[in-house]
Amino acid sequence: MIKQRTIAQVVKAIGIGLHKGEKVTITLRPASANTGIVFRRVDLDPVVDFETTPEAVGDTQLCTCLINKDGVRLSTTEHLIAAVAAMGIDNLIVELDSSEVPIMDGSALPFIYLLQKGGIEEQNAAKRFIRIKEKVRIEEGDKWAELEPYDGFHIDFEIAFDHPAINESRQRIGLDITTKSFIEEISRARTFGFMKDIEYMHANNLALGGSMDSAVVLDEFKVLNPNGLRYSDEFVKHKILDCVGDMFMTGHNILGKVTAFKSGHDLNNKLLRKLMATESAWEWATFETPVTMPAPGLELAPA
C-alpha cells in the first residue's frame, strides 16, 4: 500500500517576510493521518488555522494568500506548498508567528531542506491521489490552463514575456514531476520581478522584504543579480514551481497533466476550483501495491 506521510520530527527555520520585511519563525510539526496540510498563525490569540483548499485562496495579487471565514490572512504560502507537494507529504502542521511565510531565497529549495531535515515518516493509512478522468480547461483572454488524464503528473508550461533577458531563455518546458525531478530541475528556480516595480512597491510600503537575496531582479534589459541565473530557463521553471504548489491546494497529489499558457496563481486556482466542481472529471485513487508512474508521493522521498 502507498501510505500517507508526515515528517518524523519538529523542525524550525527563520526568514524574512516578503511583504513586511520582518523576521518570521516557521515551525513544521508532524500531523496524524488524514489531518491534511494545516497552516497555523500562532501570533494571534487564539491561534488561527487555515485549511489547504482551493476555496481558501482569497488573493493572488502579489502571492498566494489564504483567507479564512473571518477575513484573517496568511500570505506567501506558494513555495512551501510546492515543496510539500513535491516531497509527497500529506499531513503537516505549519506554525508561523507572522501573517506571512518567509520568502527565504525566493525558491522552494530552503523548504525542501527543512522537510528533509524533519525526515519522512510513513503512516498507517492509504495515500489518496486525485486522478483526472476527463479534460477541464479555463481561459481568460489569451491565457489558458487545462488538466487532462495522464499516467503520472506532468506539467507543460509556456510563458511569454517581451523582455531581452527572458527572450534569451527557453520559455516552454514539459516535465514529469517527481520528487527527484522537482528537487533537481525546479526547486532552485526563484521568483522574479522588475526593479521599477520593486521600487514602486517599496515606496508604498509593499514587498519590503523583496531584494536580490530573494528574487531574480531585472531592469529593462538584463538580470541585475551579480551571480545571474541558477538555470538558463529559470523564469519558466519558477512558473512550474508555482504551478506544482497551486495544484496541491487540495492537499492531495494529482495524477494528471497540466498544460498552461501565460497562467499564474489566479488562473491555476480557478482551474483547480473548476476541476473539483466537475464531479465527472476526477476520482479518488489509492494504490495497494507500489507503482512506478512519475509523480510525487509514489516513491518514498529521500530524507
From Swiss-Prot:
Pathway membership, UniProt: Glycolipid biosynthesis; lipid IV(A) biosynthesis; lipid IV(A) from (3R)-3-hydroxytetradecanoyl-[acyl-carrier-protein] and UDP-N-acetyl-alpha-D-glucosamine: step 2/6
Catalytic class of the enzyme: hydrolase
Active site residues of this protein: H265
Hydrolase in keyword set: yes
Matches recorded under Gene3D superfamilies: lpxc deacetylase, domain 1, lpxc deacetylase, domain 2
Ligand binding (Zn(2+)): H79, H238, D242
GO terms (BP aspect): lipid A biosynthetic process
Xref: InterPro entries: Ribosomal_Su5_D2-typ_SF, UDP-acyl_GlcNac_deAcase, UDP-acyl_GlcNac_deAcase_C, UDP-acyl_N-AcGlcN_deAcase_N
Known cofactor(s): Zn(2+)
Keyword Zinc attributed: yes
Keyword vocabulary terms for this entry: Hydrolase, Lipid A biosynthesis, Lipid biosynthesis, Lipid metabolism, Metal-binding, Zinc
EC number: 3.5.1.108
Catalytic activity: a UDP-3-O-[(3R)-3-hydroxyacyl]-N-acetyl-alpha-D-glucosamine + H2O = a UDP-3-O-[(3R)-3-hydroxyacyl]-alpha-D-glucosamine + acetate
Molecular functions (GO terms): metal ion binding; UDP-3-O-acyl-N-acetylglucosamine deacetylase activity
One of the record's GO cellular component terms: membrane
Function: Catalyzes the hydrolysis of UDP-3-O-myristoyl-N-acetylglucosamine to form UDP-3-O-myristoylglucosamine and acetate, the committed step in lipid A biosynthesis.
Protein family according to the UniProt entry: Belongs to the LpxC family.
PANTHER family per the UniProt record, alphabetical: UDP-3-O-ACYL-N-ACETYLGLUCOSAMINE DEACETYLASE 1, MITOCHONDRIAL-RELATED (PTHR33694:SF1)
Designated name of the protein: UDP-3-O-acyl-N-acetylglucosamine deacetylase
